[in-house]
């Protein structure tokens, strides 16, 4: 069950990062209100705090988190931007998740 908790934490962490970056994007590129920077900052602070909750060495967390981030970004592309992922987007996401699983859940002594 710790694996499920780890993956869930990665998903929430990725959502916080992507949402924060997207809010900044809306302000910078879509000419939306500067007030979007308030939830943007809160989201990015939550992202950093969530990263600190992961139960392994920071470098390993960052490496594995990248795989989950890719999947969440493709999901964001579909849900928020309304662009359906291609087969290659899905294949690449699956490979990234496999890499995350190997990094996080492989047996090790340290």
From Swiss-Prot:
It is a multi-pass membrane protein. Its main location: membrane. One of its GO terms (cellular component) is plasma membrane. The keyword Transmembrane helix applies. SUPFAM superfamilies: Multidrug resistance efflux transporter EmrE (SSF103481). Keywords: Cell inner membrane, Cell membrane, Membrane, Transmembrane, Transmembrane helix. The keyword Cell inner membrane applies. It is found in: Cell inner membrane. The chain crosses the membrane at residues 7-27, 33-53, 63-83, 87-107. InterPro entries: UPF0060 (IPR003844). NCBIfam families: PRK02237.1. Belongs to the UPF0060 family. HAMAP family: UPF0060. PANTHER family: UPF0060 MEMBRANE PROTEIN YNFA. This is UPF0060 membrane protein Noc_2955. It comes from Nitrosococcus oceani (strain ATCC 19707 / BCRC 17464 / JCM 30415 / NCIMB 11848 / C-107).
């Amino acid at each position: 069950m710790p694996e499920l908790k780890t993956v869930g934490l990665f998903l929430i962490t990725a959502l916080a990062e992507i949402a924060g970056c997207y809010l900044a994007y809306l302000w910078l590129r879509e000419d939306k209100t500067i007030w979007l920077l308030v939830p943007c900052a809160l989201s990015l602070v939550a992202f950093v705090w969530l990263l600190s909750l992961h139960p392994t060495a920071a470098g390993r967390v960052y490496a594995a988190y990248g795989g989950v981030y890719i999947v969440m970004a493709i999901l964001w592309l579909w849900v928020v931007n309304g662009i359906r992922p291609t087969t290659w987007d899905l294949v690449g996401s699956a490979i990234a998740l496999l890499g995350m699983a190997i990094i996080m859940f492989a047996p090790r002594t340290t």
